[in-house]
Regions:
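Charged C-terminal helix
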Residues: 294-327
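Glycine-rich phosphate/dinucleotide-binding loop and adjoining beta-alpha-beta core of small-molecule
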Residues: 1-13, 66-253, 322-326
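Short glycine/serine/threonine-rich phosphate/pyrophosphate-binding segments
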Residues: 43-58, 62-64, 122-125, 176-181, ...
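Substrate-binding N-lobe of the ribokinase-like
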Residues: 28-83, 89-90
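A short, basic/flexible loop-to-alpha-helix module at the beginning of a structural domain
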Residues: 17-33
């Protein structure tokens, strides 16, 4: 198969320093950038915790977790900095308007969103992702949101999907699995609003391709996905690839310590925080991968390749970002 013509490169230390967010002396939490994370399900509350910890350590001014009420007592002691939006229970097919009304209160003030870590692979998760991205039936009068600003009143945001705010969204894990069940979902979304972060299995479901083809031709598949979906793609693997269909970046280093549950949740939270601070889709994805690889190598020096767990990564990523800030 033939790749379309595009620019190919690597994202190195100089690129990382150049893209790193910088805070002004008068910054406050909302000017830095808040991120809303829609994550967690029974048995997967840790995904929400890891994603939120990573977002905070990567510089988000505020982290808001959209979760179900029963998970809050488990999450709050571990991530006391987070605030919460309580998701409604029950069949969202009949309550999607209530969901959007609930989420809108905090979403209107956030600069980026993360959807998917640990949401579960069930009808509720699929309905949730569909409603949040505006793919399901929309309330009368809701549009694709051109011209909305953070200064608008809360009432101006009632019933809007996350896309209505014209802010970037990371779709990860079960968010990707939900999209894979919706025919032609991409034609209903604006271009270059999402960073999709699949591993090989999730990409197989998104593209309806066998995993062996993705492993054999990862660059072609990543580019094809970016062009089909008209979004930015971060295909995890060896190498990890970042592309918007016009440029392709390869992260050649692949620390074996990252082969651990939760590392993808950390990456999603890191990218969400970087997007909230104003980075482009491609720069946020690249810097998230770069810092995550550096953090893993730092941890391997002390813990080896076997002893690193995902909970070690957020602080190590913060240390790597601090080193870039001093460079």
């Amino acid at each position: 198969m033939t790749e379309p013509e595009l620019t190919i490169g690597q994202f190195g230390p100089a690129d990382a320093v150049k893209s790193l967010p910088r805070r002004s002396a008068g910054a406050h939490k909302w000017s830095v950038g808040g991120v809303m994370i829609v994550a967690g399900a029974p048995g997967y509350v840790g995904a929400a915790i890891l994603c939120a910890m990573a977002a905070g350590r990567a510089g988000a001014g505020l982290v808001n977790l959209a979760v179900h009420r029963p998970w809050i007592p488990s999450i709050a002691p571990v991530v006391p900095e987070a605030s919460f939006t309580i998701l409604p229970d029950g069949d969202l097919g009949s309550t999607s308007s209530r969901l959007l009304d609930t989420v809108s209160v905090k979403a209107a003030k956030c600069a980026a969103f993360v959807v998917g870590p640990g949401l579960g692979d069930d009808d509720y998760a699929r309905q949730l992702v569909s409603a949040l991205l505006g793919i399901s039936a929309r309330r009368q009068g809701a549009s694709l949101g051109f011209g909305s600003t953070q200064a608008q009143s809360a009432n101006d945001h009632v019933g809007k999907s996350l896309l209505d705010y014209e802010r970037p969204i990371v779709v990860d894990a079960d968010g990707l699995n939900a999209l894979a069940t919706i025919d032609d979902w991409w034609v209903r979304l604006p271009e270059q609003r999402l960073v999709l972060t699949p591993h090989v299995g999730e990409m197989s479901r998104l593209m309806d391709l066998p995993t062996n083809q993705i492993i054999a031709e990862p660059e072609w598949v990543a580019i094809a996905a970016a062009n089909r979906f008209r979004q930015s793609i971060l295909l995890k693997g060896n190498p990890t690839l970042v592309t918007d269909g016009r440029t392709l970046f390869r992260a050649i280093d692949s620390p074996p310590s990252l082969a651990t549950a939760g590392s993808g949740d950390v990456l999603a939270g890191t990218i969400g925080a970087l997007l909230a601070q104003g980075l482009s889709l491609i720069d946020a994805a690249n810097l998230g991968v770069f810092a995550g690889i550096r953090a893993a190598r730092r941890l391997e020096a002390d813990l080896g390749t076997l002893g690193v767990i995902a909970g070690d990564l957020p602080r190590a990523i913060a240390i790597e970002l601090a080193a870039l800030e001093r460079a």
